[in-house]
Amino acid sequence: MDSTGELLFTILSSLAQDESRSISENCQWGIRSLFKQGVVHINTNRFYGYDKDEDGRLVINPEQAKVVRWIFESYMDGINPDIIARRLMEQGVPGCMGEPKWTVDTIMGILQNEKHMGDAILQKTFTADYLTKKQVKNEGQLAQYHVKDDHEAIVSKELWDVVQLEIQRRKDYMKRNGLRTMGRNTDEQPFTNRVFCGVCGQLFWRRTLYRLNGSIKAWMCASRCKGKKVKGCINDTLLEADLHKAFVMAWNAMLENREDFLEHWKAQLNDQNPLVAFRAKQFMKLTEKAKPMKELDVTIVSKTLDHCEIKPLGVIDFYFLDGSHIGLVTGD
């Protein structure tokens, strides 16, 4: 190509680019004008729980809505997102694309999507580059518009608000204790990342102890074994059987003294923090006609326990999600 051809090509490319930018800006202006008017435009292909009617309005997909409600309820029962995702896949529940593929991000996206409570926040993302069409998260660069009661809700606003508070509580818990997750396989090991040392404050780890007559599970302070010639934490090792027994004792003590706790819960029902009121109602329901626990109930641990502290001489302090504290001594 000679110099004249190259010049012509450059001019035409520039014109095409200007045209592309002009079209992009016009489209964005039109969309933002609709946003200002509160007109909601949502692609339901990747939006779980809703379909669209002939007029483009969001309508509930009954089968998907059942799954959404179950996800919200499970989360407030103390089930972590990875467990929720695994159970949905095990049951073969179709995701938004029709296949049983669920991830932690998918679950968290459903829990944090305000559209499930009937509202819509417009312009969460925007096109940063008209050439690449790359979408970026709107973190204050452009105005956002909150449309309330735009469509029928799948979950109540009260439940949605409580879930957001619980999400933040778990984030704060992990940050405060230096954790990356709330624990894996917590549906089988509910004490994971919930047991702390009452001497040095470190996390207790679950370990296998080998003896002549076999092996047993036990919990010990993470800072106990620091290496040769380095003195670790002096706290005792706790057999898992004793930890389970201690929780059963603590829970049964709550049931036995329910009337005393009831005054505490009733007062919390009017708390300005919706999560506090939710927990009070939850504990009242769990203990209403409950029979004494004979062996560890994993679901009760997941629903009720915030954390526990292990201290020397078999002392264990249990801290529950309603703010209650029960201390006891294990062993003979």
Sequence positions of predicted segments:
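Phosphate-interacting basic helix/loop segments used at nucleotide- and nucleic-acid interfaces
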Residues: P292-M293, T299-T304
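Conserved catalytic breakage-reunion loop centered on the nucleophilic residue
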Residues: M1-L286, L296, H307-D332
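Non-catalytic DNA-recognition/assembly elements of restriction-modification systems
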Residues: K289
